[in-house]
């Protein structure tokens, strides 16, 4: 009996599966600024290239699950989508983020 699933998940040009090389989903917890996002994406891209592993850049545009009402939540959907598109085109990385409500999928 095999414990390997017979499926794979592909995000952009990165495939995650038991029979594929190691790949990472990595990035800052919260999208704080364009400069910070580019600094992180650049550092992660350099590391993944150097190690020869796939990378999907992941960060959240809205941290809705804060324990403090005064906690930072992020840059919001519209501004973040522009930054995500720029990260994709500048670094050639697929970008992943959280979905909080059904409406955000439309």
Where are these regions (language model features)?
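N-terminal amphipathic alpha-helix/helix-capping segment at the start of soluble metabolic enzymes
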Residues: 1-24, 82
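Glycine-rich beta-alpha loop segments
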Residues: 23, 40-51, 58
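N-terminal active-site wall of soluble small-molecule enzyme domains
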Residues: 59-106
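Short glycine- and Lys/Arg-enriched binding-loop motifs that mark or flank ligand-binding interfaces
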Residues: 23, 29, 67-70
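Hydrophobic faces of well-ordered beta-strands that scaffold small-molecule active sites
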Residues: 23-27, 55-59, 95-97
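Glycine-rich, aromatic-flanked loop segments that form ligand/cofactor-binding clefts
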Residues: 6-8, 55-64
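Glycine-rich anion/phosphate-binding loops
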Residues: 30-46, 75-82
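Acidic (Asp/Glu)-rich catalytic clusters
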Residues: 15-19, 45-52, 85-90
């Amino acid at each position: 009996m095999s414990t390997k699933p017979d499926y794979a998940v592909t995000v952009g040009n990165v495939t995650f599966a038991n029979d594929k090389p190691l790949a990472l989903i990595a990035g800052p917890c919260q999208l704080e600024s364009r400069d910070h996002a580019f600094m992180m994406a650049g550092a992660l891209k350099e590391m993944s290239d150097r190690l020869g592993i796939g990378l999907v850049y992941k960060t959240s545009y809205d941290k809705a699950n804060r324990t403090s009402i005064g906690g930072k939540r992020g840059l919001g959907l519209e501004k973040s989508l522009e930054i995500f598109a720029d990260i994709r085109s500048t670094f050639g990385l697929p970008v992943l983020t959280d979905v909080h409500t059904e409406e955000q999928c439309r």
